[in-house]
Amino acid sequence: MKRFTKTMAALGLAAVMGTGSAFISLADVTTSVNPVATSRKSGWVDVQNHWYYFDANGNPVKNQWIQDGNNRYWMQEDGEMSKQKWVYTEGQWYWVNAQGAQASNIWVEDGGSWYYMGGDGRMMTNTWLENNGTWYYLTETGAAARGWKELGGKWYFFNDSDCSMANDTMVGQYRVDANGVYIP
């Protein structure tokens, strides 16, 4: 069982143990404190702005999702909740926001590329996406396509600025129809 070394005022510990709250905050102290053995609480524990989740037996949850209300949170190998990062599990990529919640039905910008998290939270890949009346193509890496792209034997152009598919317009000296397909 992993031990957390933190400082905690005796009054703070007594107050935490008396509340029965699922959210526990361990403050600064000079002793070695094991939140599981000390509090025997289940639920969320805040250790100096690092969040952990303990099951009904007081064990830290690791390498899995925690469902809390309408949100899911990824608990890392060390038991800490992931924040503002990619999570790769079961062959899929997910994004968790700054609060640690799994993102869904939302665009995520990372390193100059745009990615779309579907309704189930997975990064969409190798697929068309219609979003608010605009079409996009999400590549094998999940990044939204930019520039010319051949798909199914047809050529399409995706704007560099917002990755949207051009349609019924001229792209340089080339024309694309209402469906975005290059007209030779």
Description of each model-found segment:
Residues 2-184:
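Extracellular adhesion/carbohydrate-binding repeat motifs centered on closely spaced tryptophans
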